[in-house]
Amino acid sequence: MYDYGTFTFESKAEVLDKAKTFWNPDKTQFWTDTGVDLVIDRREGYFLWDMGGRRLIDLHLNGGTYNLGHRNPEVMQAITEGMEHFDVGNHHFPSVARTALAQRLVETAPASITKVAYGSGGGEAIDIALKSARHATKRRKIVSIVKAYHGHTGLAVATGDDRFAKFFLADQPDEFLQVPFNDIEAMERVLAPGDVAGVIMETIPATYGFPLPAPGYLEAVKAITEKHGTLYIADEVQTGLMRTGELWCITKHGIEPDILVTGKGLSGGMYPITAALLSDRAAKWLDEDGFGHISTFGGAELGCVAALKTLEISTRPEVRSMVHYIADIFDQGLQRIQADHPDWFVGIRQNGVVIGLEFDHPEGAKFVMRELYENGVWAIFSTLDPRVLQFKPGLLLSRELCEDVLDRLAVAVARAETVVRGRKAS
């Protein structure tokens, strides 16, 4: 019997069966068929325990939600203490928690940012960003990159790959245009007519497998947006909050975006909260009609408490130093592993602890993912480029755990290569 206080289950098998009945049959079956029949029970730091008792090192982190680890003690303490004063709050009125977080976000953001609008999920924050761009420019078209992913809400999903954008028959698809990543000429062509409200890009596109921007590419895109009166929207949901060794990855490029979107890790992994950080131009609607976007749970006060503590931890000098230290360990270790498998392990895409590992097979990352799972590590393939494994170490990993992960990865890469080469031979 598994007793969780307000509910119980007899077994893992019962959970899987009822998940297919009452929750999501296709996704549950997909993971079972893939060999990852994971039902998370206990979780602590950078470890997960399956209901069967097996421990996994978490290198997925739910897209960076658990940058600081699962159930981070400092974040939990902040929320516990916050519950003495706060709850969700009332979204209509000024709030000490929302105001304190908004001020801190503006203080830590690029100089262009002056206001904050809150959401409860990343897609909602993206929707706020796109609506803000449309209001500011009085234009409707939005440009994103091919293989983009910015969430699953109404406007956000329309910016993404057709797999998701067309699934629910997205409205007015002609208003959402896509160009290849790192193709500056294509970006110039699509913006030249002067009818685009905003360009939205992840600074390093996560679901596309973390391809790195070519030198000067993002800077050139920003210059083109300024030339044509288009807003530049930096989606930092997965690349922000110190994952690249800077609080916001976009600042490494010297870019001051018109809008910056943050989420996932902002929650400390404990209470949902996201935000669209707006420049004066993008925030005009807040002066004209502050009821233009209403979100009951956007900027929930307990979420603000969690986010403030998360920002405080993430901006500590020792955490910044730790990220660079961890990145160096993995840089050296990954190169050693790649040298042993040069025809199989063909690419390392790394900026800080934002890492993608590329393999020589159309779905190579799925094979490595499965072998890693069997060897006690959870990392996920890139949905829109399954050649690439998303490999996302936490910000506070110990050297010992880094080396443990590298040892397990070396075994998994070798085993996956044997499986794939064996299939090709047969």
Model-derived regions, located:
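Conserved N-terminal phosphate-binding loop of PLP-dependent enzymes in the Aspartate aminotransferase
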Residues: 1-426
